[in-house]
């Protein structure tokens, strides 16, 4: 496995691999890898592609009072996990390599990034789409793999690829969970044992919401309020949002029909966790 810090080196290696007839797969990450990331690699390897993993904690997607400075970083640990999973190349640039001067150009997807995490974290998705578009230009992959725990992000990236005519297939990979149901996240390490136990209410509430839906409940507002009540009764978590949206365009829905997703964001102490469940209406 190769570790590159420079854009030029990545481009040279990718060009060489293409010359040998190989396709290129990109797995973008911010590092501190867990099984969710490694599942993306597993999916990427199925096509026989040369697998590039980016590990870059992108400052543009963090707000002024967020956790950029303390976001976990451990390249040695990540390199071992990545190599064991079959990654061919890690691209781990410094901030100065990705943004060598004041960044005057940004990529932003309107509408899809205005709600949910976009409303709670202004500028977040502009930072995401800017860095992902840069990675797409640098690596020029045939396919890129994203986890669907960040379902809103996945839809935004798909829209960006469509609108900007990137010749890239975006592949969404289902949420990977711990044995007890907690969605895997690099931020889970911030949780105290008590907070982690409380955080299991996210998966429980999504499961209950599915039960209510299967029993015939179709009012989005009713399900949202029942989820909030459950979270408040069973944890000390501070709810950021509980919303049911169209899984196609993120529009609010009143009556559940078609494909929807239930999106949650809850803060346990200083740690903000997200989770979701996609359902097919009748």
Swiss-Prot record:
Q: What is its EC number?
A: 6.3.2.1
Determine if RNA-binding is one of this entry's keywords. no
Q: In which pathway does it act?
A: Cofactor biosynthesis; (R)-pantothenate biosynthesis; (R)-pantothenate from (R)-pantoate and beta-alanine: step 1/1
Lineage top rank: taxon:
Bacteria
Pfam families membership: Pantoate_ligase
* Reactions catalysed according to its record: (R)-pantoate + beta-alanine + ATP = (R)-pantothenate + AMP + diphosphate + H(+)
| Residue numbers annotated as active site | 37 (proton donor)
Single Gene Ontology MF annotation = pantoate-beta-alanine ligase activity
Cell compartment(s), UniProt? Cytoplasm
Key word Cell wall biogenesis/degradation present: no
GO CC annotation, single: cytosol
Q: Which SUPFAM superfamilies match?
A: Nucleotidylyl transferase (SSF52374)
Offer one example of a GO biological process linked to this entry.
Answer: pantothenate biosynthetic process
Q: Where do the annotations place (R)-pantoate binding?
A: 61, 153
Q: Where does ATP bind?
A: 30-37, 147-150, 176, 184-187
Q: Summarize where beta-alanine binds, as residue positions.
A: 61
Keywords, comma-separated and alphabetical: ATP-binding, Cytoplasm, Ligase, Nucleotide-binding, Pantothenate biosynthesis
State the CDD domains in the record.
PanC
Task: State what this protein does.
Answer: Catalyzes the condensation of pantoate with beta-alanine in an ATP-dependent reaction via a pantoyl-adenylate intermediate.
Q: How does it assemble?
A: Homodimer.
Spell out the family assignment given in the record's similarity comment.
Answer: Belongs to the pantothenate synthetase family.
Q: Which HAMAP family match?
A: PanC
Q: What is this protein called?
A: Pantothenate synthetase
Q: Which organism is it from?
A: Desulfitobacterium hafniense (strain Y51)
